[in-house]
Swiss-Prot record:
Gene Ontology cellular component list: plasma membrane
UniProt-recorded name of the protein: Probable aldehyde dehydrogenase
Reactions catalysed according to its record: an aldehyde + NAD(+) + H2O = a carboxylate + NADH + 2 H(+)
Matches recorded under Gene3D superfamilies: Aldehyde Dehydrogenase, Chain A, domain 1, Aldehyde Dehydrogenase, Chain A, domain 2
Annotated Pfam families: Aldedh
Coiled-coil stretches: none
PROSITE patterns on file: ALDEHYDE_DEHYDR_CYS, ALDEHYDE_DEHYDR_GLU
Record-annotated active site: 263, 302
Organism: Mycobacterium tuberculosis (strain ATCC 25618 / H37Rv)
Length: 507
């Protein structure tokens, strides 16, 4: 067991500044109108730094810097951009523990998750896209003996990126790595709930990039996010967050006819077929962990398996075992490596989760585990902690339909394969899903029949850089991860060349 020291305390791996500025043009720049807001840690609820409350004037400054850098960066050789991305990955890797502590203090997640997933995945994404851009090739088509079509990949230019509060550092990597690899410059706006860890990241890697290639502007959605997304000076906007905000982002972008990538909400089904209990072996244990994945990152994951569908033949036995597994989840100090469940990212989010607990009760759903705010004592009592909660009910309830974004799972049963698929697809969303079966044919069929962009089969919550991620239905537009993501940040130019000396003969 290791308990990391809190930022700024004796023996700490990192310290936060008491006041941050925006990162624009390779420099730390104060907000134009001199406004700041307090940023509390969800671990204790106490403020620990101030962050710029930026507005359109600051966005314009960042766009000036990004446009100044765009021509030079866009013309660098792919190998040069790849080398810089690899240096960023190395710098993150070297400071992994410090970045994990920074992320915990800003977001509230347990440090074991940040060390095992968030930071290594950020490294993985920079390294992957460094390799992908070097491997990307154009295309040549011979139209006839004298005519050739060349296809080139060219950067879009300046892109706007708005990231959520559930994985601040990782989401910055998801957005920045492909955009930079493709030769774009970026203006990034972190979520106002978790602005500090991305600023700490920039303090570590900012010197590796030419000035203006990456610019970070903080602030609230209406004051900074809207001016960025609606600007006619960006060539694309990429957004991760809730579906309602995604609709607004799409409206803003539509006025300028620019492309969008949207990764939005989810209400992911996690299906357990009867054969998972054919034996009480490693596979069964893995499936029970798969059920409990609804509590990973405090349920603050767009693909949270927040609907569990258990085949009726094993419903009672499996649910009993799953409840035991869930009740064994350890809550405590997020900086303790033994802690499995940290705090919600904000008090507002905690209150939202608690409101859905009441909604579930009013609908007649039954709580079989959790259901209350977690009281941890000491100075953690001011933090935003929630017990992992299991409801049982029916798929027509609001807790089955609406995204809660907390450690809450709604459980129901199904009779057969068709019933399972029907329940799974009875949702507005289609971001993720899980399928658990020892039968390969069943697992494959279910994976194909579920209407979701990412279906985990006999696993859950794996996010490798080289696997495409994105949603069906109201869960978004476009994909992240995988080399295909490069094309979301590129124009395709066709150069159609005739090598014939002869006229076409029309006139």
């Amino acid at each position: 067991m290791t308990v990391f020291s809190r930022p700024g305390s004796a023996g700490a791996l990192m310290s936060y500044e008491s006041r941050y500025q925006n990162f624009i043009g390779g420099q730390w720049v104060a907000p134009v109108h001199g406004r700041y807001f307090e940023n509390p840690t969800p671990v204790t609820g106490q403020p620990f730094c101030e962050v710029p409350r930026s507005d359109a004037a600051d966005i314009d400054k960042a766009l000036d810097a990004a446009h100044a850098a765009a021509p030079g960066w866009g013309k660098t050789a792919p190998a040069e951009r790849a080398a810089i991305l690899n240096m960023i990955a190395d710098r993150i890797d070297k400071n992994a523990a410090a970045l994990a502590v920074a992320e915990v203090w800003d977001n509230g997640k347990p440090v074991r998750e940040a060390l095992a997933a968030d930071i290594p995945l950020a490294v993985d994404h920079f390294r992957y896209f460094a390799a992908a851009i070097r491997a990307q090739e154009g295309a040549l088509s011979q139209i006839d003996e004298d005519t050739v079509a060349y296809h080139f990949h060219e950067p879009l230019g300046v892109v706007g990126q708005i990231i959520p509060w559930n994985f601040p550092i990782l989401m910055a990597a998801w957005k920045l790595a492909p955009a930079l690899a493709a030769g774009n410059t970026a203006v990034l706006k972190p979520a106002e709930q978790t602005p500090a860890s991305v600023l700490y990241l920039m303090s570590l890697i900012g010197d590796l990039l030419p000035p203006g290639v990456v610019n970070v502007v903080n602030g609230f959605g209406a004051e900074a996010g809207k001016p960025l997304a609606s600007s006619d000076r960006i060539a694309k906007v990429a957004f991760t967050g809730e579906t309602t905000t995604g609709r607004l982002i799409m409206q803003y972008a539509s006025h300028n006819l620019i492309p969008v990538t949207l990764e939005l909400g989810g209400k992911s089904p996690n299906i357990f077929f009867a054969d998972v209990l054919a034996a009480h072996d490693d596979f069964c244990d893995k499936a029970l962990e798969g059920f409990t994945m609804f509590a990973l990152n405090q349920g603050e994951v767009c693909t949270c398996p927040s609907r569990s569908l258990i085949q009726a033949d094993i419903y009672d036995e499996f649910l009993e075992l799953a409840a035991i597994r869930t009740k064994a989840v350890r809550q405590g100090d997020p900086l303790d490596t033994e802690t499995m469940l940290g705090s919600q990212a904000s008090n507002d989010q905690l209150e939202k989760v608690l409101s859905y607990i009441e909604i579930g009760k009013q609908e007649g759903a039954v709580i079989i585990a959790g259901g209350e705010r977690a009281e941890l004592g000491g100075d953690l009592s001011g933090g935003y902690y929630m017990q992992p909660t299991i409801f049982t009910g029916t798929n027509n309830m609001r807790i089955f339909k609406e995204e809660i974004f907390g450690p809450v799972v709604a459980v129901t049963s199904f009779t057969d394969y068709d019933d399972a698929i029907g329940i799974a697809n009875d949702t507005l969303y289609g971001l993720g899903a899980g399928v658990w079966s020892r039968d390969g044919n069943t697992a494959y069929r279910a994976g194909r029949d579920i209407q979701a962009g990412r279906v985990w089969v006999n696993c859950y919550h794996l996010y490798p850089a080289h696997a495409a991620f994105g949603g069906y239905k109201q869960s978004g537009i476009g994909r992240e991860g995988h080399q295909m993501m490069l094309q979301h940040y590129q124009h395709t130019k066709n150069l159609l060349v005739s090598y014939s000396d002869k006229a076409l003969g029309f006139f």
